[in-house]
A protein has these predicted regions:
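Loop-to-transmembrane helix entry
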Residues: 1-14, 125-127
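Helix-to-loop junctions at the C-terminal end of transmembrane segments
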Residues: 15-30
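Structural signature of the two symmetry-related core transmembrane helices
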Residues: 32-47
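Helix-loop junctions at membrane interfaces in 12-TM secondary transporters
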Residues: 47-61, 70
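Intracellular juxtamembrane helix-capping segments at the cytosolic ends
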Residues: 69-83
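Loop-to-transmembrane helix entry/capping segments in MFS-fold secondary transporters
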Residues: 82-96, 123
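A membrane-interface helix-boundary motif in multi-pass transporters
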Residues: 111-137
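Multi-pass alpha-helical transporter architecture, strongest
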Residues: 131-166
């Protein structure tokens, strides 16, 4: 099942990042696109952690793939907020954050998985790492939403009308 699920994830992510992300972000705007992507990831991770049957994970893969729109939406907003002379520094900082997360993430989530299945844990809960990931993603969504505040999203169809009225 692992090989099949990874193949499905790869296909779904290619579809989302290869074509749907731009369309969804274009329709919703960057801020709402980021929120949708992070919310989809939160729901999928919580679902993976709570799914009592393997087939349920397959059903959640589509929801999880929608999380792939968060990155492009965030990247677009961040890129627009800095001048051309700062783009390299910003992209370098984003890559550094991604690298640190790529190192720390597996250590944290492997440890949390071990806690969930460990002999000394009460009741054994192998989905603990996924619930933890859902919680961290939800926290990130709340923080991002607050940080964006009144972000002027040029892709948001309602933004132009609101800014004229103000």
């Amino acid at each position: 099942h692992v090989g099949a699920s990874l193949a499905i994830v790869g296909i779904l992510m290619a579809v989302v990042q290869g074509g749907l992300a731009g369309r969804i972000i274009g329709a919703l705007g960057e801020k709402k696109g980021l929120a949708l992507g992070m919310l989809a990831t939160t729901v999928a991770m919580a679902g993976y952690g709570l799914a009592p049957y393997g087939w349920m994970v397959y059903a959640l893969l589509t929801v999880g793939a929608l999380g792939g729109i968060a990155g492009p939406a965030a990247q677009a907003m961040i890129t627009r907020e800095v001048g051309a002379d700062e783009q390299g520094a910003v992209q370098g900082a984003l890559n550094s954050i991604t690298s640190v997360a790529g190192i720390a993430g597996p250590l944290i989530w492997t440890w949390l998985f071990a806690v969930g299945i460990g002999a000394d844990s009460q009741g054994r809960f192998p989905g603990l790492a996924f619930i933890g990931a859902a919680a961290v993603t939800l926290l990130g969504l709340v923080m991002a939403w607050r940080a964006m505040g009144n972000h002027k999203d040029p892709l948001d169809k309602d933004w132009g009308a609101k800014s004229v009225e103000q």
